[in-house]
Regions:
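Aromatic/acidic polysaccharide-binding cleft in carbohydrate-active enzymes
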Residues: 275-349, 364-367
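Distinct, well-ordered alpha-helical segments
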Residues: 85-89, 112-115, 140-152, 208-224
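Noncatalytic carbohydrate-binding groove/subsite architecture in carbohydrate-active enzymes
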Residues: 178-307
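Carbohydrate-binding surface patches
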Residues: 364-398
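C-terminal beta-strand-rich structural cap/linker in extracellular carbohydrate-active enzymes
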Residues: 48, 407-427
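Substrate-binding cleft of extracellular glycoside hydrolase catalytic domains
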Residues: 123-183, 273
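Catalytic domains of carbohydrate-active enzymes, especially glycoside hydrolases
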Residues: 74-109, 126-128, 157
Length: 427
C-alpha cells in the first residue's frame, strides 16, 4: 500500500452550483501536472497505437447483442441535499424509476453517516453507489483503503453495486493519469476479493467520447478486472444525439466501445452509461458547461427520449442513468425557487410508464432520417418515432401520444424531431 511522497501543492475546490470541481486554470500547475505524468502519457500513447487498428477491425465484425431488459434499463441520479427527502422520494415514486445512482464523495467521507442515511431511504430501489475520488485519496492508498472499507461496510446491506471513480480523464476530478486511476481502482479490487466477494465493481468511468483513455484502462498489466464497464457518454457538445463525431452517432459510439471491450480481458462487455444529460440555457452558474453547449428545455426533453431510444436500440447497453433528478442547470427539476419540473420530467415519466416491461422488436432509420424504435408487450405494439426532417405519416388505426403522453387526434401527422408514440392493440 503506497502513499505519494511527490505531492503537488494544489486544491481542487468544489463548485456547489454544477456539482463538480472547478476547472484548473493555473497554467503553472497544469505544466507541473503534465510533467509529473509524462511517462504515463507515453504508455497511453503506445497502447493506443497498438489497439486502435484492432478496435477498428472489431467494429466492423458482427457483435453479439444483449437481450436488454426494459425493466432494468432506465435509471436516474439522485443526490443528497437537493430538497426535502420526502419530496425527493415522492418524485422518484411518481416517475416510477426503480434504478438509482447515488454519489458518495470521498472529500466528504467524514460525513459518511448522512450519505448512508440518504441511501437507506431508497432501500426499496436497485441502487448503484458512485464513489467520487479526491486528491488526498488518490495520493494516499492507506487512507483510500480505510475509506472504502467504511463505505462498503456501511452500504453493503443496501446494494452490492459500486462505481469506483468518476470522470477519470478530467484532471479537475483529481486523477492526473490513467495509471493513477488504475492504481486507485486496484485498492478497491483487492478489498473486494479479500473481504467483500459479493460486491460488483464498475469502472472505468471515462467521460465523453474519449476512448483513448478508455483503451488505457482496458489494456494494462494491473491485476484487476471490471465486473461491469461504465462510461459517462455525453454527446451534448455535438448537439443532438444523432449528430456525428468522427463519423459516429450515439449508436456508433456505443458499438465502438463494445468492440474495444471485446478485445480486452479486463472487463465484461456489460456496458452501463452512468451519466448523461444536456446543459440547460440561461441557468448560469448551475449549467456545467458554457452557454454555447446549452439547449432550451424543449430541446432537452426531445434529446432525452431520443438518447434513450438510440442507446436502447443498440442492444449493447444494459442501463442508462440520467444525471440527475434535481439540478437547475441540467436536471429534470429546478430547485432554485421551490421545485419546478422541467418538461423533461413528464417525458421521463411517460417513457418509463409505456416502455418498462416491453420487449425490443426493431430499429429502423431511412434516408429521410426517419427513426423508428419498435417495442411490444402482451397487450400492444408501440413505436417511438421521430424525423430530423419533416415528413407526413399515416396514423390510421393507431393511438398517437406526444412524448409527454398526451393524446394527439389525427389520422395524418407531420412528424418532426419531436418524438411521438404510435400504439396499436394486438389482434
Amino acid at each position: 500500500m503506497k502513499t505519494n511522497k511527490n505531492k503537488l501543492k494544489l486544491e481542487l475546490p468544489w463548485d456547489k452550483y454544477s456539482d463538480q470541481p472547478y476547472v484548473i486554470k493555473n497554467k503553472v500547475l497544469k505544466k507541473q501536472i503534465y510533467k509529473k505524468v509524462r511517462f504515463d502519457s507515453l504508455k497511453m500513447l503506445l497502447v493506443n497505437i497498438l489497439i486502435w487498428p484492432l478496435a477498428v477491425i472489431a467494429f466492423f465484425l458482427p457483435a453479439k447483442k444483449r437481450k436488454v431488459d426494459t425493466k432494468q434499463f432506465f435509471g436516474l441520479g439522485v443526490n443528497l441535499g437537493k430538497t426535502n427527502l420526502a419530496k425527493m422520494q415522492s418524485m422518484v415514486d411518481d416517475l416510477g424509476c426503480q434504478h438509482l445512482i447515488i454519489r458518495i464523495p470521498l472529500h466528504d467521507i467524514e460525513n459518511l453517516d448522512k450519505y448512508v442515511h440518504f441511501i437507506a431511504s431508497f432501500s426499496d430501489k436497485d441502487l448503484l453507489i458512485n464513489i467520487l475520488q479526491d486528491r488526498r485519496h488518490v495520493e494516499n492508498h492507506i487512507l483510500l483503503q480505510k475509506s472504502l472499507s467504511k463505505i462498503f461496510d456501511a452500504c453493503e446491506q443496501y446494494t452490492q453495486n459500486f462505481q469506483i471513480g468518476h470522470a477519470v480523464n478530467r484532471k479537475k476530478w483529481a486523477f492526473f493519469s490513467m495509471d493513477e486511476y488504475l492504481a486507485f481502482y486496484r485498492v478497491a479490487y483487492d478489498l473486494k476479493y479479500k473481504h467483500y466477494p459479493n460486491l460488483k465493481l464498475m469502472g472505468s468511468a471515462v467521460i465523453d467520447f474519449e476512448y483513448y483513455f478508455t483503451i488505457r484502462t482496458l489494456f494494462n498489466f494491473y491485476p484487476l478486472k471490471f465486473d461491469r464497464f461504465n462510461t459517462l457518454l455525453y454527446v451534448d457538445r455535438r448537439g443532438a444525439p444523432e449528430n456525428k463525431q468522427m463519423g459516429l452517432d450515439l449508436r456508433g459510439k456505443i458499438k465502438l466501445l463494445h468492440a474495444i471491450l471485446r478485445l480486452s480481458a479486463k472487463s465484461s462487455t456489460d456496458i452501463v452509461i452512468t451519466e448523461t444529460n444536456w446543459p440547460i440555457t440561461e441557468t448560469f452558474p448551475y449549467a456545467p458547461t458554457s452557454e454555447k453547449e446549452c439547449v432550451n428545455v424543449d430541446e432537452y426533453a426531445k434529446y432525452l427520449l431520443r438518447y434513450y431510444m438510440l442507446a436502447y436500440s443498440s442492444q449493447l447497453v444494459s442501463q442508462v442513468y440520467w444525471h440527475q433528478l434535481i439540478a437547475p442547470g441540467y436536471g429534470l427539476v429546478d430547485n432554485r425557487d421551490g421545485l419546478s419540473k422541467y418538461p423533461a420530467y413528464s417525458v421521463f415519466k411517460c417513457m418509463l410508464k409505456l416502455l418498462s416491461g416491453c420487449k425490443f422488436v426493431d430499429f429502423k432509420v431511412d434516408s429521410n432520417n426517419l427513426y423508428k424504435v419498435s417495442f411490444e408487450n402482451t397487450q400492444y405494439d408501440i413505436i417511438v418515432c421521430w424525423c430530423l426532417q419533416k415528413v407526413t405519416i399515416d396514423t390510421l388505426g393507431k393511438q398517437v401520444l406526444s412524448k409527454e403522453g398526451n393524446n394527439i387526434s389525427a389520422t395524418k401527422i407531420v412528424l418532426s424531431d419531436d418524438p411521438i408514440y404510435l400504439i396499436s392493440d394486438k389482434a
